[in-house]
Amino acid sequence: MIDMKAFQELALSFPHTEQVPHHERLGFKVISRRMFTTYLERNNTANIFLTPTEQQLFCEIDKVNIYPVPNKWGEKGATTFELDTIEKAVVTEALLSAYNHVIKPKTKTTK
């Protein structure tokens, strides 16, 4: 089980990250960039922002406790992780993946 304190430590363990309020959730983002995950204390869940392909792979690990967010964000890869039942290593891997997408330099398209 991963509780709020453990999740905060994991999310903030990546370089240049910060915790910010996000509606009723805690948001974790790269400073001066976008969020890579949010945490909801009342049900101990995290929404981790993956690619749709990564989302599919993580959902295959545990279809009951890892699933797409049920809205447009979920179609884009936002994935709910129920932290009471998921191994820390799985959550850490998902957070690292989401973090890497945020820090990755954007490629410029030429016309």
Task: Enumerate the language-model features and the residues they cover.
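Charge-dense, helix-prone N-terminal extensions
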Residues: 1-111
